[in-house]
Amino acid sequence: MSRSKESDELIFFVNGKKVIERNADPEVNLLFYLRKIIQLTGTKYGCGGGDCGACTVMISRYNPISKKISHFSAAACLVPICSLHGAAVTTVEGIGSTKTRIHPVQERIAKGHGTQCGFCTPGMVMSIYTLLRNHPEPSTEQIMETLGGNLCRCTGYRPIVESARSFSPNSACCPMNEKWKCCLDEGKNEPERKNSVCTKLYEKEEFQPLDPTQELIFPPELMRMAEDSPNTVLTFRGERTTWIAPGTLNDLLELKMEYPSAPLVIGNTCLGLDMKFKDVSYPIIISPARILELFVVTNTNEGLTLGAGLSLTQVKNILSDVVSRLPKERTQTYRALLKHLRTLAGQQIRNVASLGGHIISRLPTSDLNPIFGVGNCKLNVASTEGTQQIPLNDHFLAGVPEAILKPEQVLISVFVPLSRKWEFVSAFRQAPRQQNAFAIVNAGMRVAFKEDTNTITDLSILYGGIGATVVSAKSCQQLIGRCWDEEMLDDAGRMIREEVSLLTAAPGGMVEYRKTLAISFLFKFYLDVLKQLKRRNPHRCPDISQKLLQVLEDFPLTMPHGTQSFKDVDSQQPLQDQSGRPIMHQSGIKHATGEAVFCDDMSVLAGELFLAVVTSSKPHARIISLDASEALASPGVVDVITAQDVPGDNGREEESLYAQDEVICVGQIVCAVAADSYARAKQATKKVKIVYEDMEPMIVTVQDALQHESFIGPEKKLEQGNVQLAFQSADQILEGEVHLGGQEHFYMETQSVRVIPKGEDMEMDIYVSSQDAAFTQEMVARTLGIPKNRITCHVKRVGGGFGGKTSKPGLLASVAAVAAQKTGRPIRFILERGDDMLITGGRHPLLGKYRVGFMNNGKIKAADIQLYINGGCTPDDSELVIEYALLKLENAYKIPNLRVRGRVCKTNLPSNTAFRGFGFPQGAFVTGTWVSAVAAKCHLPPEKVRELNMYKTIDRTIHKQEFDPTNLIKCWETCMENSSYYSRKKAVDEFNQQSFWKKRGIAIIPMKFSVGFPKTFYHQAAALVQIYTDGSVLVAHGGVELGQGINTKMIQVASRELKIPMSYIHLDEMNTMTVPNTITTGGSTGADVNGRAVQNACQILMKRLEPIISQNPNGDWEEWINEAFIQSISLSATGYFRGYQADMDWEKGEGDIYPYFVFGAACSEVEIDCLTGAHKNIRTDIVMDGSFSINPAVDIGQIEGAFVQGLGLYTLEELKYSPEGVLYTRGPHQYKIASVSDIPEEFHVSLLTPTQNPKAIYSSKGLGEAGMFLGSSVFFAIAAAVAAARKERGLPLILAINSPATAEVIRMACEDQFTNLVPKTDSKCCKPWSIPVA
């Protein structure tokens, strides 16, 4: 039969506008097309792998059979444009803008303070928008499932969820208790309200209602196209790949016969990742998305037949419908599948990933295939030779040649049988986090019994995540004929232990944990089946203790809720004075509409080149040769830049721009390729040939560095009292060590820079995503060998920084500047997520050793602490980090005799750098560990020991700085009260007595955080305020808007000082021409010091205006300004703040370093699953001393965001390195920050009743970093839960649990009969897959 006619015309719509592309390139994805071809830059690049949600768009299609339009969210970075024929794409620009009208979703997420840096906001908006197009009144479960595929690094998610919940029918109150009554309605906060405490950050009444009738209509032309669609074969030929999309099954089968090795693609969620990250290319790609037979659903008495082309979301909806109509005993397999479909990947992936693709890919971590395998499912396949049914069994999943599809065969559908009465099916998975994460281990298990007995007639167990393929526990077949009892369970556990074999060096690591999970899942299955058998035949089966059965309940996907309280402004404060009020972020609406411009959103200039770098693949090696000839000959390549092209300084203090002669870490930049597109530059980097010769030593870990005495800088030391003498008088002495892993900044906007040569006098404009524009300017000037006055750095906004954009942008901008100077053309240098994580380094991993002397009542007499941090291969800010860790290590505790020492270890890893908290989260964690250990040794409650050792009266820190701890005690006591600590601790104890396999823990921690830098010049700031003759005001200052709301606060300051409404005032960009010689924006001082500068400039201007105002007191602002101009009075003023007096003398070990302290306390409660290591954050209460907040909405947002980032540091985020120093975790696919389901179910934040802080503007305090350490309250709550489990099992107490407390750490700490079944791995026999670097 002849094939249908070909067409090369691609037709789709974007935001209601028709797009026609002839011979579209199959390798071009929708994200690139939107951003670079049609200049819709609201959709952001965050990771390129569909894991972060930044590029979320809505895709709509019309089904000519059902006559319905479907809307679904998708990750644009994975959607090939060739797959969009007949589709309508809606981006954030298409639903609303400041030029037309903003959509209710955009309005609510902005006014609800759900945006900080704003980079993730368009993706969040589009996820919620798509949900509302399908469900105008969504349920809380739908909201949580929708947002599970979107990441945010700034907000802590609470305000985003709250904005989405405002569309839900039950959004009028917070579900604070089991009665679903609002805490405010019950009068719980009456005392605070009497004291003018406010709990409203915005006015819901101002929100415009959602009107579904006002949405963009689906293009009628596409409906006609779908109805009249000829059976043409769409064929698009690109540079390397041809995309063929047949319209009939016959054409599809013929194409598969002609191109048997061509992959079939519908969702591109697997193939797309291979093409992008593994550089796999396919000459031919076949898309069967138009074949109707692949989307058929048939429901019979035997089971369901599901078309292979159905998306996983469609499969979930179909199964949910069937499960709601049929008895549970008939839908066991369906329920098991649904359990995993709720959390598999993110919503954007489930919406496009096909059932057939998921099955055929046979990924070892597939969540569905083990269930299909045990469920006796069948694959219906077809070829030109006819149809065939293939069992979806362990042979198929293992890739046995005789059991899989032939190259010319196509999977048409999957038959999923109904379960039988005495058949039980269960599914299990454990992932790094609850949503949007591949399973570490998963399983499908099925057992059948002889009717009305517990005698096994069939047993099937399949595991994912155990080997290179799905693994079948075949030996368990020997159990057929046995009774379902404990003896059978013991034998099954031993069989699985023998069958599940993982080598020490198995990819993915966690060998003991994965083996333990396999056995733990079996036990859960045993209990689950026993429970169901008991229900059906109560007399035959033994009673099961409820204490054991609680573990069968998975942690629910619940929507977080909570309260935020702060001091309201004085009733006498003028309405136009917005200081102290919860004002929306200045760019909030622009964030939500996608109109906020980030570095890579700027239009490409004529002749602009794109830069891609070649990085070292060796940790320590000599460069023998570098051959770039093949790269230079590649299409589009203009030049290759190396160290020889640097006209000035190639780096200082060992931090080279380009490696020369030697490389000192994996990820060090060796050379760069400049080409006319990024894709061509990237492809050319793979053609650069470098020959290395390994060098010794190779130092990766802290232990390596100690062995080789490899350090950066001298040892730092502080001491007070007589430590040795105090040890002699102590009742007990405790020694130990604790390890804290590193942390990736994971700012949503990767490192970005554009360098534009101006053509004369060596001048350059640099647009950079940087926290320190002046340092970038200085480094570029030094690199090029020119004065700084030729370089102007521009920073409009930064998509998150957290310290990671302090020093690194200077290096990357210099790399780009050399390329720009050499080629004479503009250069765009935007790091991909993987390169960003590989090159830039993060938070310093730490080893802490301690020796503590204490009395039996818990009073600590002496402590001797040694800290070692992994600094990486160059100094960067590491010496400052270790200094800060030592200075702040004591936290809230008065230890009369204390010695602290610290060293920076020099290793062959990328240099670690500044990160939010700057050493405090590490140092205070070590202290929290040994204080808790003291409590355990004394058999005292941890909170009693913490309270006993806290500062109580005016005193001096270890560096001899005086401070008043009054507000520290207030925070502690208020947090105790707000959290109902003692009553909840009693409830936790009662829960633990009644549950064996699940345990709860509660912990409360105090915090003393010192704000600022150790030198006065670090605190200086400048501002320029200009008043125009129409009365409008332009403010410029030296701070950078990172999402922390500094620009919003500066407008509030100027508004108060000039006594004009905020609407009169505008901030444009920060640049080094307007405000020179700036200091990095960090250390929680940005608003403090720049606010003083803005205040100074405004006061100068008001002083000039005083005579005019006094002459015309009844005039208005515009009249006064016009008169000032007529009188030739300058309406421009530079403000300056010299900085806080600060200095530290390390020889004497003393100094008044910090202008003030921020105090706080946090109480967190968690529940852990002792069998899997999973945990649920139940509730957190935070009390923070913010003094008089300039903007409570911004400050509470900073507290929440920092807390969740800290929660990630201490419990989730894990950087994994090979023994050779290669970073494995190079994106959200492998590295898991907290998602929306990881934050506390109840999340309460209170700002302490204000007290005076004369050091900062308007008596405010900088709160950007302090909340980070409070995340450790979750860690210590987990440790308490683990302690409860170990105590019940009669195990010795673990005095120090290493951080992060991941699922692996938690599970392996809860030792039991199952962990004891697993033999310990011997790392001496072979290298492990990954190693801890602390």
UniProtKB/Swiss-Prot annotation:
<feature type="binding site">
    <location>
        <position position="801"/>
    </location>
    <ligand>
        <name>Mo-molybdopterin</name>
    </ligand>
</feature>
<feature type="binding site">
    <location>
        <position position="116"/>
    </location>
    <ligand>
        <name>Mo-molybdopterin</name>
    </ligand>
</feature>
<dbReference type="Pfam" id="PF03450">
    <property type="entry name" value="CO_deh_flav_C"/>
</dbReference>
<dbReference type="InterPro" id="IPR046867">
    <property type="entry name" value="AldOxase/xan_DH_MoCoBD2"/>
</dbReference>
<keyword id="KW-0479">Metal-binding</keyword>
<dbReference type="Pfam" id="PF00111">
    <property type="entry name" value="Fer2"/>
</dbReference>
<keyword id="KW-0285">Flavoprotein</keyword>
<dbReference type="InterPro" id="IPR036010">
    <property type="entry name" value="2Fe-2S_ferredoxin-like_sf"/>
</dbReference>
<dbReference type="InterPro" id="IPR036884">
    <property type="entry name" value="2Fe-2S-bd_dom_sf"/>
</dbReference>
<feature type="modified residue" description="Phosphoserine">
    <location>
        <position position="320"/>
    </location>
</feature>
<feature type="binding site">
    <location>
        <position position="47"/>
    </location>
    <ligand>
        <name>[2Fe-2S] cluster 1</name>
    </ligand>
</feature>
<dbReference type="InterPro" id="IPR014313">
    <property type="entry name" value="Aldehyde_oxidase"/>
</dbReference>
<feature type="binding site">
    <location>
        <position position="52"/>
    </location>
    <ligand>
        <name>[2Fe-2S] cluster 1</name>
    </ligand>
</feature>
<feature type="active site" description="Proton acceptor; for azaheterocycle hydroxylase activity">
    <location>
        <position position="1265"/>
    </location>
</feature>
<feature type="binding site">
    <location>
        <position position="120"/>
    </location>
    <ligand>
        <name>[2Fe-2S] cluster 2</name>
    </ligand>
</feature>
<feature type="binding site">
    <location>
        <position position="117"/>
    </location>
    <ligand>
        <name>[2Fe-2S] cluster 2</name>
    </ligand>
</feature>
<keyword id="KW-0963">Cytoplasm</keyword>
<dbReference type="GO" id="GO:0051537">
    <property type="term" value="F:2 iron, 2 sulfur cluster binding"/>
</dbReference>
<dbReference type="InterPro" id="IPR016208">
    <property type="entry name" value="Ald_Oxase/xanthine_DH-like"/>
</dbReference>
<feature type="binding site">
    <location>
        <position position="411"/>
    </location>
    <ligand>
        <name>FAD</name>
    </ligand>
</feature>
<dbReference type="InterPro" id="IPR036856">
    <property type="entry name" value="Ald_Oxase/Xan_DH_a/b_sf"/>
</dbReference>
<dbReference type="InterPro" id="IPR036683">
    <property type="entry name" value="CO_DH_flav_C_dom_sf"/>
</dbReference>
<feature type="binding site">
    <location>
        <position position="1042"/>
    </location>
    <ligand>
        <name>Mo-molybdopterin</name>
    </ligand>
</feature>
<protein>
    <recommendedName>
        <fullName>Aldehyde oxidase 3</fullName>
        <ecNumber>1.2.3.1</ecNumber>
        <ecNumber>1.17.3.-</ecNumber>
    </recommendedName>
</protein>
<keyword id="KW-0274">FAD</keyword>
<dbReference type="InterPro" id="IPR037165">
    <property type="entry name" value="AldOxase/xan_DH_Mopterin-bd_sf"/>
</dbReference>
<dbReference type="InterPro" id="IPR012675">
    <property type="entry name" value="Beta-grasp_dom_sf"/>
</dbReference>
<comment type="similarity">
    <text>Belongs to the xanthine dehydrogenase family.</text>
</comment>
<keyword id="KW-0411">Iron-sulfur</keyword>
<dbReference type="GO" id="GO:0050660">
    <property type="term" value="F:flavin adenine dinucleotide binding"/>
</dbReference>
<keyword id="KW-0408">Iron</keyword>
<dbReference type="Pfam" id="PF20256">
    <property type="entry name" value="MoCoBD_2"/>
</dbReference>
<keyword id="KW-0597">Phosphoprotein</keyword>
<dbReference type="Pfam" id="PF00941">
    <property type="entry name" value="FAD_binding_5"/>
</dbReference>
<keyword id="KW-0560">Oxidoreductase</keyword>
<feature type="binding site">
    <location>
        <position position="77"/>
    </location>
    <ligand>
        <name>[2Fe-2S] cluster 1</name>
    </ligand>
</feature>
<dbReference type="InterPro" id="IPR002888">
    <property type="entry name" value="2Fe-2S-bd"/>
</dbReference>
<dbReference type="Pfam" id="PF02738">
    <property type="entry name" value="MoCoBD_1"/>
</dbReference>
<comment type="function">
    <text>Oxidase with broad substrate specificity, oxidizing aromatic azaheterocycles, such as N1-methylnicotinamide and phthalazine, as well as aldehydes, such as benzaldehyde, retinal and pyridoxal. Plays a key role in the metabolism of xenobiotics and drugs containing aromatic azaheterocyclic substituents. Is probably involved in the regulation of reactive oxygen species homeostasis. Is a prominent source of superoxide generation via the one-electron reduction of molecular oxygen.</text>
</comment>
<dbReference type="GO" id="GO:0005829">
    <property type="term" value="C:cytosol"/>
</dbReference>
<feature type="domain" description="FAD-binding PCMH-type">
    <location>
        <begin position="236"/>
        <end position="421"/>
    </location>
</feature>
<dbReference type="GO" id="GO:0051287">
    <property type="term" value="F:NAD binding"/>
</dbReference>
